[in-house]
């Protein structure tokens, strides 16, 4: 198998997870294994953990399941996220589609380093981190509600809140 990815490692775009799920999907098709999309995503998590990349927790769902979605899962070792599809009009309607920008800074960091810091804080029962993670869970639901309602103003406000939460969770969100 030969792969070419023109996206640099550590870009934050989930490339390793998406590539791993693509390879597993190709093996599934070639061998007639009859895996569904959830199986491929679960096997991607296992593969990424075996390779010690630290990724594979959610990125592959973005690539394997099309469209705008909210992923929800319960606490515990075995993750079986529920995929809830959302309308895409805030991203495709002519009044809104030009209001979105994905900007790549060229600064790279690997998921392994980022997740090590976050998981360490969870295992140490860091009150501020656990509280922030709970807030982020509620925030994701608020964001999906804004998208469902087509409320662009609320959506934009929540994007700002997402940025603030990411900065609080990960000290490297704004590297020097």
Model-predicted regions and their roles:
Residues 10-21, 55-69:
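FAD-binding core of FAD-dependent oxidoreductases
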Residues 42-52, 60-176:
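C-terminal nucleotide
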Residues 29-33, 53, 164:
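A generic secondary-structure boundary signal that marks alpha-helix termini
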Residues 1-46:
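Anion-binding (especially nucleotide phosphate/pyrophosphate-binding) glycine-rich loop
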